[in-house]
């Protein structure tokens, strides 16, 4: 690279050398003569200085402002949108060199002030330490002087005793030295240490080799904290500080306590065990459960995994909210006698509803579809002996869960048994539900007016179920009644109220309402409607209620006759409006203080219900994954089911899901309470399902989709019909089997030759009937040697269609000439036979 001097640079830029040197000096460059060399970096520095001095720097902007504008759109309601414009403004300021220099000077001054303050502080500390040292020395001198005076003042006898015991005195002095170490001046300790150093025995090389390695005393924590260690000559040298965050491998497995709730994800479980999530996933794969890290595990699975990995498991309840709610619902008040809740149970068509109709002076049974009860009905009746609340349950086999709920919510069970029919399956089931709930049973032997009635047969049948009549020494009253004529109804009510007196039923009317959901439905005009039986306290219009995973304010209350009421006390059934959804039958209803608490608990229950449901569903899939491997896929009948009430929906789902076998199954892809809507029709279209409406109808939008897409939609009002139709559909999906029927057997007696057909077998029909143009088998020694078709059948040179047993005929077999005497010709037909479930 060519070197440029100041003189050459002045010629290039066309300026005098003196002026260029002056400018270079202003730029801070060290050049003083024209012969000095100018480097590229010095040229750049000179150029920057000249630009700044000629106004380029002043023309640069000192302040830059950046503006940013973003526009977003928010959706409000259905189709309305709102545009939101956000404007942001930022200003960047470029400081001048003077300001930067002033800032630097200020920082230097602050640093100097801090150093000065630190120095003054150190001087004060040193002065304070010197003062303390002088005070300590003065105190030690005073103590030594006092000790000398005390010794000189001792009597002569003490001096003689001290002289007589020269050995004991040094010992006492030593003890005094040990007790008062601070009295000895520091220089005396140094002298003693120096004397010991000179007088102690120094070991030889051999002794050093034989001697064990000396133990290293632990370093002083004070010295280590200062970062120094004591040197060989009493000085201090720098000590490398140890890493405070060092890690040591554990010598044994660490057992941790793992808290597991009702559900837990794989990642949370791994975090509690302090292992990687991948390790838990790998371990569960080895156990035969393929999972992902975010998968929810149920409590049992998580407990098994944690225990297998060697950790302690603590099962915790996540019901803090529920416990707070239960605590807030505690109420102390005066308890009064309440009316009994009586559930009428029994087999289908044994007259339960008819008996209730006579008691209520109503006609419910006449208006029921198919003459059978398909919902739980709740009524309260005022009698001469007091009020009684009745629950009427269905007797059909499909309504098992409904009957179980009726038994749980009741005080007394009236078991209706038809005198002309006897103990039936649902009668036995009702007895089991009542015994499981611990409820007393009153047996009503109905239809006693019929000539074929046999009450003794009823007693024998129920005694076998451990329901012993009172006259036999048991505790179950048997009352013969006739729902048609009203015979024995008063005696039945008297027996019920007598049982209620024995039970001593109590309730607190002043407490907040608490009860159970008997039934729920979705009304098109009023929304979700729940039939609630108040069990304790008083339910009032306007109360905030929590029902299972639903909540809401009671907007209106209706009694069983549809009349509006303002409040309902214990043992009163009411319909409430205002919930945010249709609760499940059997859910507990409680009155809470405010909407916030109700929403909080309801959302907690919804999340918990969803997690448990997902965990169980996935566990079921994992259990069946290997069982289903290698098997053909089942044929599935998809159904979208809508019902009028929640109880009927549950009963139908349970009954339909139980249909099917190893080849066909029913899958309810969607179900709900209320009419068939457009979304139901679209779901049926997407899943290739059949739409079933039980006591409900489709709206106009749904009907339009059904007609346009050709969907199959059916209405029902009797549970028998829907179950029978689904059974027929499943039977059709099974297809048919081909079965062979042997029509006849002919024995070959002789063989003839025909120019047209070849070998003709002269046969005697021994069994059945031989038909022409039917499939045949040729058997030789009872072994099939040919299978074909019977082409020609003649009798006395005449073609015939069939030949009966005991007659001779000639048989020509198509494409077969190896017929021999003694063969048997078996004629059969293939028939399609429909399969059944």
From Swiss-Prot:
Localization annotation = Cytoplasm
Q: Which InterPro entries match?
A: DNA-bd_dom_put_sf, EF-G-like_DII, IF2_assoc_dom_bac, IF2_II, IF2_N, P-loop_NTPase, Small_GTP-bd, T_Tr_GTP-bd_dom
Listed Pfam families: EF-G_D2 (PF22042), GTP_EFTU (PF00009), IF-2 (PF11987), IF2_assoc (PF08364), IF2_N (PF04760)
Q: Which residues form the signal peptide?
A: none
Function according to Swiss-Prot or TrEMBL: One of the essential components for the initiation of protein synthesis. Protects formylmethionyl-tRNA from spontaneous hydrolysis and promotes its binding to the 30S ribosomal subunits. Also involved in the hydrolysis of GTP during the formation of the 70S ribosomal complex.
Q: What keywords are annotated for this sequence in UniProt?
A: Cytoplasm, GTP-binding, Initiation factor, Nucleotide-binding, Protein biosynthesis
Segments of this protein annotated with the region G4: 446-449
Name it: Translation initiation factor IF-2
Region annotated G2, chain positions: 371-375
Q: Does the keyword Transmembrane apply?
A: no
Region (G5), start-end ranges? 482-484
Protein family (similarity comment): Belongs to the TRAFAC class translation factor GTPase superfamily. Classic translation factor GTPase family. IF-2 subfamily.
Question: Quick one: where's region Disordered?
Answer: 94-253
Q: Which residues form a coiled coil?
A: none
**Biased composition annotated in UniProt, kind: Basic and acidic residues:** 95-148, 172-188, 220-229
Gene Ontology CC: cytosol
Q: Where is the tr-type G domain?
A: 337-506
* Binding residues annotated for GTP, in chain numbering: 346-353, 392-396, 446-449
Q: Per the record, which residues fall in region G3?
A: 392-395
Q: Which CDD domains match?
A: IF2_eIF5B, IF2_mtIF2_II, mtIF2_IVc
- What molecular function does GO assign, one term? GTP binding
Region G1, annotated ranges: 346-353
User: Main subcellular localization, coarse class?
Assistant: cytoplasm
Query: Which residues fall in a compositionally biased region of kind Low complexity?
Result: 149-171
**Keyword Protein biosynthesis annotated:** yes
**Basic residues bias spans:** 230-244
